[in-house]
Regions:
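Glycine-rich, histidine-containing beta strand-loop boundary motifs that form or position
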Residues: 88-92, 133, 157
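An acidic/histidine-cluster motif and surrounding catalytic segment
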Residues: 129
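Short strand->helix junction
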Residues: 58-61, 132, 136
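Terminal catalytic/cofactor-binding subdomain
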Residues: 1-125
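Loop-rich catalytic cores of soluble enzymes, especially ATP-dependent carboxylate-amine ligases
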Residues: 104, 134-224
Length: 224
């Protein structure tokens, strides 16, 4: 079996903030325009008060770091041109999810229609790490091992103790909010890529999901 390439890519989601009130601002469609909004390295997300960056495919951690420094600087400049600032945390400490506007793209409007207030409440921000593993069975084996480490990684990365103006008493309230969504959390142990494919096929045939991209486990294959 050919060893995996182990290429790296990272996506980061940021809060768009009014510098005077410190409230979230639903302003992504004004910050981004045209093709850049859909195809660029800086993209919209479910809520208009969120912006996402995505690195190119990288070969080393040093390349990833350089990409993140470049993209973080760029998104801060874009926000500053519109009199706004960027913040990074798993949740906003006091802005209300009820008043946030959904990004008017078919993908996000569909999620809002399907999941109603569960989608509206999903006002959370995160970091997603993509690792290149070409062999599907190796990928499933890696997922099975990674399941054990997910709680440890979460412990090291918590950044969301506040929600709706309250100290929740938890270090990662983000994970509690995301738990309300279907098909989330730590994935089950899977025997093989074939078993995973059968699971996805069952979900599609029964009308639970249109495709595997709607499985949102903490560790999962990429269907994009």
């Amino acid at each position: 079996m050919k060893p995996p390439s182990l290429t790296l890519g990272i996506e980061e989601e940021y809060q768009i903030i009014d510098p005077e009130t410190r409230e979230l601002r639903s302003y992504i469609t004004e910050i981004l325009n045209g093709d850049q909004m859909l195809l660029g390295e800086i993209k919209p997300e479910l809520h208009q008060s969120m912006v996402e960056i995505g690195t190119r495919v990288c070969r080393t951690p040093a390349e990833v770091r350089a990409e993140l420094v470049r993209l973080r600087g760029h998104v801060m400049q874009l926000a500053a041109r519109n009199g706004l600032v960027i913040a990074a945390a798993g949740t906003h400490p006091f802005s209300s999810w009820i008043t946030q506007e959904i990004t008017p793209l078919e993908r996000y409007m569909g999620v809002r229609q399907d999941l109603a207030d569960l989608a509206q409440q999903l006002l959370i921000f995160g970091t997603h790490v993509h690792i290149g593993i070409e062999d599907p069975d190796f990928l499933i084996d890696a997922m099975n091992v990674a399941r054990y480490f997910v709680p440890h990684v979460l412990t090291l990365s918590t950044s969301s103790p506040f929600w709706m103006g309250r100290d929740t008493g938890l270090k990662s309230y983000r994970s509690i909010i995301f738990r309300n969504f279907p098909r989330t959390g730590i994935p089950p142990v899977l025997e093989s890529a074939t078993a995973y494919g059968a699971l996805v096929d069952t979900l599609v045939r029964t009308g639970c999901v249109p495709n595997g991209s709607k499985i949102w486990w903490d560790v999962r294959p990429n269907h994009s």
